[in-house]
């Protein structure tokens, strides 16, 4: 039971490592993809990287860094403050969540949002998860309209 309670899926671990990479990239200025290989290699050297889905990590990290300007453009209308005022953690989580919503329709929108919320609970500020949930929920309604409308309401 203890092992199950502490276990996280390989995809969740991949998202956690991707967030660390996006965070490092944002701290370096958050422009271009020239640092992607170095960030990727550094994170793969982490002791517990073997617990992560390496392919999903690569997809997320490199995809987010490549698509960041477009991703930001899509979530900007839904944030309640200037982009510069977002913490690097919230910014990184929104980039990852937006990337999943926009480029990976095989991941159900509720899963993409929930995974981003879990990242925010683990790594973000006190109520950061509420902010992330609200922004990604609005983005999902825009980019996954049919899926959101077809989902049963609680």
UniProtKB/Swiss-Prot annotation:
Transmembrane segments: none annotated. The keyword RNA-binding applies. SUPFAM superfamilies: NusB-like. GO terms for cellular component: cytosol. InterPro entries: NusB-like_sf, NusB_fam, NusB_RsmB_TIM44. Coiled coil: none annotated. The keyword RNA-binding applies. Keywords: RNA-binding, Transcription, Transcription antitermination, Transcription regulation. One of its GO terms (molecular function) is RNA binding. Pfam families: NusB. One of its GO terms (biological process) is DNA-templated transcription termination. PANTHER family: ANTITERMINATION NUSB DOMAIN-CONTAINING PROTEIN, N UTILIZATION SUBSTANCE PROTEIN B-RELATED. Belongs to the NusB family. Involved in transcription antitermination. Required for transcription of ribosomal RNA (rRNA) genes. Binds specifically to the boxA antiterminator sequence of the ribosomal RNA (rrn) operons. NCBIfam families: nusB. This is Transcription antitermination protein NusB.
């Amino acid at each position: 039971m203890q092992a199950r309670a502490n276990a996280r899926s390989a995809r969740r671990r991949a998202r956690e490592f991707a967030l660390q990479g996006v965070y490092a990239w944002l701290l370096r200025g958050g422009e271009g993809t020239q640092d992607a290989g170095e960030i990727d290699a550094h994170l793969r050297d982490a002791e517990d990287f073997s617990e992560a889905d390496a392919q999903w990590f690569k997809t997320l990290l490199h995809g987010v860094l490549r698509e960041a300007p477009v991703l930001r453009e899509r979530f900007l209308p839904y944030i309640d403050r200037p982009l510069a005022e977002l913490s690097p953690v919230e910014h990184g989580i929104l980039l990852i969540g937006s990337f999943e919503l926009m480029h990976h329709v095989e991941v159900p929108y509720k899963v993409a949002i929930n995974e981003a919320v879990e990242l925010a609970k683990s790594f973000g500020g006190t109520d950061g998860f509420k902010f992330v949930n609200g922004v990604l929920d609005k983005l999902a309604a825009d980019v996954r309209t049919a899926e959101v409308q077809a989902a049963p309401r609680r």
